[in-house]
Amino acid sequence: MKTILVEISYGELLDKISILEIKKERINNSEKLKFINDDLNLLKIQMHKVTKSKNFKGDEKLKKLFLSLKEINAKLWVVEDDKRICEKNSDFGEKFIKLSRNVHFLNDERSKIKLEINNLTDSKIKEVKQYTSY
């Protein structure tokens, strides 16, 4: 198996884990689930190594932030599915606009949580975002 080893922030790692957990819960295709489970196990092993090697003072806080991240990613999953239904039906009216706007709001929340995770874990890699204010 070929892999690329690259450093990522704690926020990004937890984000990836949360998305894979959501996929594991919602995808029924056994072939896809095999890949999802493999990826999830690899990432969880790495996270376990890191948290075990470092004494995180904010372990409970980290768990709460992870759950918040997973909740937001689950909402994004539904919103994106609903947008695809609108696309399929060529429905680009109010519902589509509302869903599209929700993606921005949810991604802004997601970004804040990832930054909070990075600050809590003293991650040397930080995800920086800048968008036009609304």
Feature roles, as predicted:
Residues 1-134:
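Extended, charge-rich alpha-helical interface modules
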